[in-house]
Design a protein with these regions (language model features):
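Divalent metal-binding acidic/histidine catalytic loops
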Residues: 44-46, 50, 54-307
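Acidic, low-complexity central loop/insert segments
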Residues: 2-57, 65-66
């Protein structure tokens, strides 16, 4: 059982009260839990989380512990054609998914993309998966670091439009608190967006749903300083921002499903505000498509992930 509180006194009181009800043993501050290594620096006011040990186990399981590292998890210019030959490696995708959900937003796009082929995993996909492992080999020391007193919740959202193979777009969002990401996602959109504006609109809707949940979660924990009255979400598509602020339907927006108009209501009610951020500074960009080394590193650092 992991227990947290706003002060050490409150934590001691909670442990004492619980100990009167059930038998328990206080193991002190967590060092390793559910595959996550936790390091706390009280002097610097930071908490760092990494999965170095788990990464080592995955690399050894697939014979990649001595592989040559690469600087990005997935190559630019994805090959869309399928090659012959099947590989059943669903367990590898599951292992990589656990890393994505834990501390590695930098491999979210690559792993999500590979998971779409889990029923038809070819030699080509196995080669792509091995590249992810080689990337992890070179970045196994990476940790997400949260710093007390830094900025409250901030959201970033992005979308890639019209993937060649399917015509679908991909949504991504990242929410940061205390200088690092606390929740992130990369997912293929369930519709075929007819423009980049529409794809960004769909991505913003998903981000606001996640932001609403996160805001409520912080309020339940009485962490109101990290839960602003109005949550800011950064977006790099000015057309989508204008469409949010203009409730009048036009030829470009009248076909959009009502469920994606949820975000207009959220903005009008003051729960969210959407601000423009140039693409070169968008940290959610690496969760929608392959990135060159410099941009991949920039996005990782923006998520509080340091190698």
């Amino acid at each position: 059982m992991l227990m947290v509180a706003t002060s050490e006194k409150a934590l001691r009181n909670a442990v004492q009260a619980l100990g009167e009800k059930i038998e328990l043993k206080d193991l002190g501050e967590p060092k390793y839990i559910l595959g996550l290594e936790v390091k706390r620096d009280k002097t610097q006011g930071t908490i760092s989380i990494n999965q170095k040990k788990y990464i080592g186990e995955v690399l050894k399981r697939y014979g990649m512990e001595n592989s040559k590292p690469v600087s990005t998890p997935i190559e630019l210019g994805l090959a869309q054609e399928k090659t012959a030959g099947q590989r059943e490696e669903k367990s590898l995708i599951g292992s990589l998914m656990y890393l994505v959900q834990g501390t590695r937003p930098d491999i979210a796009f690559a792993v999500n993309y590979l998971s779409e082929f889990s029923k038809n995993f070819t030699i080509q996909h196995w080669s792509m998966a091995k590249r992810v492992l080689r990337y992890l080999q070179g970045t196994c020391e990476a940790c997400i670091t949260y710093t007390a007193g830094k900025e409250p919740m901030m959201g970033y959202t992005n979308a890639s439009w019209n993937e060649v193979a399917t015509g679908s777009s991909r949504s991504a969002y990242v929410f940061t608190v205390c200088g690092a990401a606390v929740t992130w996602k990369s997912k293929k959109q369930p519709i075929v967006a007819l423009s980049t504006c529409e794809a960004e609109y769909v991505a913003l809707t998903e981000a606001m749903k996640e932001g609403s949940w996160l805001n409520n979660f912080f309020q339940e924990l009485c962490l109101n300083k990290y839960s602003p009255g109005t949550i800011t979400i950064k977006c790099d598509n000015q057309s989508a921002i204008k469409m949010i602020k203009n409730p009048v339907q036009n030829q470009r927006s009248k076909h959009i499903n009502l469920k994606y108009l949820y975000l207009r209501n959220q903005v009008e009610n003051g729960n969210f505000t959407v601000e423009y951020l140039p693409t070169e500074f968008m940290i959610a960009d690496a969760l929608t498509k392959p990135m060159p080394r410099a941009k991949n590193l920039y996005c990782a650092k923006g998520c509080g992930l340091f190698f």
